[in-house]
C-alpha cells in the first residue's frame, strides 16, 4: 500500500480509502438502494478485516449513508481492531432543515461518536457544501447549516478539545462557496485541515482551486 503523510498531524494515511456508503445487505443490492434489508454485518466485518490486512487504514462514512446505518456498521467492524490502526472520517450531514438547529446538529455529532464506538473523530467534514435546500440558494443553505446556528464555531471548539482531530469540508455545487471557504482559510478566519473534492480523469474542475497548503482527499476517483 502507498501512503501519504498528513503534514499537519503526521498521520500515515493510505492512498486508497474505504468508502462506507454502499455496504452489502442480507438481500440483493446495497444498503444505499435497499432500505428494507438490513446490512450484512458479517460481510462488512470481513471486508474491513481484508482492507486493514492489506494496508487500507482510512474509512469514510456519514450519518446519512446506508439509510442512516453506515456509521453503526462501521463502528462495529472497526472497533474489533486497535483504535490506533485506522482513521475514521465522518461528516456533519445536517441536510434536513430539522437538523439545522444547533442542538440537533450537536446531537448528530454525538450520535456519530456513539455509533462509531469512539470518543474522537480523526477527520470530520462539513458535508457537501455548495448545495441549496428548501428553496434557499447555496449561500443561504450554508449559513443555515453552519453559521446562523453557531455550529461551525462549536465544531472548532470540539477540535480544540481533541474530539475532532482534523476539521474540513467536502464540496459539491456552487463554486463560490468553495472559494469563500478557501478565502476564510487564507485570511485566518477558519483553518481547514483538509478538503475533499470529486476528482478523477473526467472531473478536474476544482483541482487548481485547492489551496496548496491544505491536504486534499479525492472521492469518485474511478468513474
Per-range role (PLM):
Residues 1-3, 48, 71, 75, ...:
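Generic structural signal for well-ordered alpha-helices
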Residues 1-86, 154:
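N-terminal binding-site loop/beta-alpha segment at the start of enzyme catalytic domains
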Residues 3-5, 13-17, 57-58, 85-89, ...:
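Structural preference for beta-strand elements that scaffold enzyme active sites
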Residues 21-23, 62-64, 91-95, 126-129, ...:
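Active-site beta-loop-alpha junctions enriched in small/polar residues
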Residues 22-42, 92-104, 137-145, 173:
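Active-site mouth loops of central-metabolism enzymes
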Residues 34-51, 100-117, 175-185:
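Short, acidic/polar
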Residues 81-102, 127-130:
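Structural motif corresponding to the early beta-alpha repeats
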Residues 129-223:
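Beta/alpha (TIM)-barrel catalytic core signal, keyed to glycine-rich beta->alpha loops juxtaposed to Asp/Glu
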Amino acid at each position: 500500500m502507498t501512503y501519504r503523510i498528513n503534514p499537519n498531524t503526521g498521520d500515515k494515511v493510505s492512498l486508497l480509502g474505504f468508502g462506507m456508503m454502499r455496504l452489502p445487505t442480507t438481500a440483493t443490492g446495497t444498503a444505499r438502494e435497499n432500505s428494507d434489508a438490513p446490512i450484512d454485518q458479517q460481510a462488512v466485518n470481513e471486508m474491513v478485516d481484508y482492507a486493514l490486512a492489506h494496508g487500507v487504514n482510512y474509512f469514510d462514512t456519514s450519518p446519512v449513508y446506508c439509510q442512516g446505518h453506515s456509521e453503526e456498521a462501521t463502528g462495529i467492524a472497526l472497533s474489533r481492531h486497535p483504535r490506533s490502526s485506522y482513521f475514521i472520517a465522518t461528516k456533519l450531514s445536517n441536510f434536513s432543515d430539522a437538523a439545522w438547529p444547533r442542538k440537533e446538529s450537536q446531537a448528530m455529532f454525538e450520535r456519530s461518536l456513539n455509533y462509531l464506538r469512539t470518543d474522537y473523530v480523526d477527520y470530520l467534514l462539513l458535508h457537501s457544501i455548495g448545495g441549496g435546500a428548501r428553496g434557499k440558494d447555496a449561500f443561504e443553505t450554508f449559513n443555515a447549516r453552519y453559521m446562523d446556528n453557531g455550529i461551525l464555531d462549536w465544531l472548532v471548539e470540539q477540535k480544540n478539545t481533541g474530539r475532532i482531530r482534523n476539521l474540513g469540508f467536502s464540496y459539491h455545487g456552487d463554486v463560490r462557496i468553495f472559494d469563500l471557504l478557501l478565502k476564510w482559510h487564507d485570511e485566518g478566519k477558519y483553518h481547514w485541515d483538509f478538503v475533499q473534492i470529486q476528482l478523477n480523469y473526467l472531473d478536474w474542475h476544482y483541482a487548481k482551486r485547492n489551496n496548496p497548503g491544505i491536504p486534499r482527499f479525492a472521492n469518485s476517483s474511478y468513474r
